């Protein structure tokens, strides 16, 4: 009798362990008749835009001069982005450059549309994208993000101030974007 109980316990344990794998293979209605399943051919290659140097080719000094914020520290610097913070701390103004390779700008724009006061089309030096403005009740328009599309890639400059007075964030974001476009190869 003990042997039968043990075998039954092992069989039930095996079925319980196997259930998630089998359930993952089941037809749960996701592939309904007539539905299309997107696929990408194995040999499809994305079309990349130009190469952007580190930090979009913009120096720490240029960011400091344009933003008029002293004591900026480049706290994150790698091949796809940079971030400048006042005194290196997370409180206060922040400025960043990001380069998204093979990433759809539409998804980023949609996120901006859900979280910013306004999002508009923009064209800088013949390149299309968006400009997003964020505001705070006590500061007014204190954040500006410019995203520009290059084939399957895009870049984004973000300029955010935390206390008055400050220069117009969108003027800075547009100028930084212009400089990055000029520095691209």
From Swiss-Prot:
A lipid is attached at residue 25 (N-palmitoyl cysteine). Keywords: Cell membrane, Lipoprotein, Membrane, Palmitate, Signal. One of its GO terms (cellular component) is plasma membrane. The keyword Repeat does not apply. Pfam families: DUF3558. It is a lipid-anchor. It comes from the Bacteria. A lipid is attached at residue 25 (S-diacylglycerol cysteine). Residues 1-24 form the signal peptide. It is found in: Cell membrane. Residues 26-50 are annotated as: Disordered. This is Putative lipoprotein LprB. It comes from Mycobacterium tuberculosis (strain CDC 1551 / Oshkosh).
